[in-house]
Amino acid sequence: MKIKKTAGRQLAPNRINEEITGVPEVRLTGIDGEAIGVVSIRDAQNLADEAGVDLVEISPNAEPPVCRIMDYGKFLFDKAKSAKEQKKKQKQVQVKEIKFRPGTDENDYQVKLRNLIRFLEDGDKAKITLRFRGREMAHQNLGMDLLNRIKTDLDEYAVVESFPKMEGRQAIMVLAPKKK
């Protein structure tokens, strides 16, 4: 969320200290979260000044509005820090692609299979593209057999998200990692 700036000063998402106007009294919460009760706005500001922290309006729509005595700078910092942590914990799932041909040799097949296993263990989806050239289009059953072999070899690592289907001269299958 971007905070608007007015004359060099940022407008906070919550009203603080003298910005809280138009209400005669507020429901006040102390620094440690203890409920102080309903007090006049002036008394609440005096208590915040004595503690050397800010009076922050938490819930402006309540009757009377709820305010808390807290260090507002620290509050914003903690809020930004927790938002950053949340963003860091989110993992972007990528789709990794491996290309096969109907005549892929056994050694090449094993290397590509190891790469597929690595992608799936990292939590990424795997897109397997089987490309047909020239007269290979007449033997699509060989390609489908290869895709079925890949599917059975990766049974313990992946589930098939989209089954093999032909798109032009390619057969495509998408695998998703199994949930642990």
Curated annotation (Swiss-Prot):
User: What PROSITE patterns has UniProt attached to this entry?
Assistant: IF3
| Location(s) in or outside the cell | Cytoplasm
| UniProt-recorded Gene Ontology molecular function terms | ribosome binding; translation initiation factor activity
Tell me which UniProt keywords the record has, alphabetically: Cytoplasm, Initiation factor, Protein biosynthesis
The similarity annotation says: Belongs to the IF-3 family.
Give the protein's biological function: IF-3 binds to the 30S ribosomal subunit and shifts the equilibrium between 70S ribosomes and their 50S and 30S subunits in favor of the free subunits, thus enhancing the availability of 30S subunits on which protein synthesis initiation begins.
Q: What is this protein called?
A: Translation initiation factor IF-3
- Per the UniProt record, the source organism is Shewanella oneidensis (strain ATCC 700550 / JCM 31522 / CIP 106686 / LMG 19005 / NCIMB 14063 / MR-1)
Instruction: From the UniProt record, report the name of the gene that encodes this protein.
Output: infC
